[in-house]
Amino acid sequence: PQVYKSIFSNDESSVTTHKRKNLTVFFSDIVNFTDLSDSLEPEKLAQIINNYLSEMTTIALECGGTIDKFIGDAVMVFFGDPESMGEEQDALSCIEMALRMKARVEELRKYWIRNGVKGGLDIRVGIATGHCTVGNFGSNQRMDYTALGGPVNISARLEGKAPVNEILISETTNNLVKGQIK
């Protein structure tokens, strides 16, 4: 919604401008999703993944995040563009979102088990903060509003290293929120 407003506000520069901004980037992924996708019928898989992505989208928007993309079962969200509440608050909002998503996944396990997902679903989360280039990237036929840079790569790597159902944050993010997260 934030990007939509920016693009359709008749501000042509918002469509072509690339900016360097400090962002807090979130990556999550469903553990063993490939195995799950191979074991379920397409309709059941679609129902489960669409339910999951809908629930995560609602939380991301409520927390003020910009949903960058879904890559299969992976979710990328960033804070700090197109609107920023300040580096510290952006990092806090991202962590609040991650904690809410983690809690919601735990609540949804019962639903998923009833719908054929043995043991429910588990996620991993990575969060990193730093300077990114953000804007529209792509070709004449297709553009994506996205963030590029070290924090994007770091958050994806942290997600891959996170223990099941846990959140790993970068040192930079930790320094911004130190003492404010329980």
What residue spans do the PLM features occupy?
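Regulatory cytosolic signal-relay segments
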Residues: 1-20, 106
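A generic structural signal for short hydrophobic patches within well-formed alpha-helices
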Residues: 4, 33, 76, 173-174
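Alpha-helical scaffold within the catalytic cores of cyclic-nucleotide enzymes
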Residues: 49-65, 81-125, 150-151, 156-159
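Catalytic strand-loop-helix junctions within cyclic-nucleotide turnover domains
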Residues: 78-89, 125-143, 164-166
